[in-house]
Amino acid sequence: MSTPSRLAVGICFMAVAACAGPSTRETPNLGRLATPSEVAAWDVSVGPDGTGLPPGRGTSGQGAIVYVQKCQNCHGERGAGQPNDRLVGGHETLATARPVRTVGSYWPYATTLFDYVRRAMPYTQSHSLSDDEVYAVTAYLLHLNGIIGESDAMSAETLPKVKMPNRDNFILAYPTRPK
């Protein structure tokens, strides 16, 4: 392309850009900023150390009742799976070609179980369980996996103290840097 042609193309681009100006067309109004109270309602993150755990308490016995009512249809009797993921067992499979990654065999922190159940379960009605029900279901699943006793109560104080069997088998991708 010759220099005069380049100049003509450049002038055309600049003219189009100058004529465009700010748009007076309205946006499609596809949303709005969330209010602080709306953000707070969904700010339910729980850390491995228990940061963010709400008040509440639940036992395995209480959790068994909730599990049968709200979880068993998807996760099977006593967490055995079918039609969805197994929640119990798999302890001897992690080093095999087909590991069974369950709450008891794979998950590194008990607080992660609470956090996930609270946010996402039951699948068809997430955020529908009370905090006491979530603690109870968490206790039930930990008991089924042989991690806590049947009468152990889970709460914001006790749950972070539960040592999961696979906790020490994870390699941190971004280890904490010394200060």
Residue ranges and their predicted role:
Residues 1-9:
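Bacterial N-terminal signal peptides that target proteins for export
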Residues 9-17:
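Bacterial N-terminal signal peptides
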Residues 19-22:
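N-terminal Sec signal peptide cleavage junction
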Residues 29-66, 122-125:
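Electrostatic cytochrome c docking/interface patches
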Residues 61-69, 80-84, 107-110, 128-131, ...:
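Sequence context surrounding c-type heme c attachment/ligation sites in exported
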Residues 64, 80-118, 122:
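Gly/Gly-Pro-rich "capping" loops immediately C-terminal to redox-active cysteine motifs
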Residues 124-179:
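Flexible coil segments in periplasmic/lumen-exposed cytochrome c-class electron-transfer proteins
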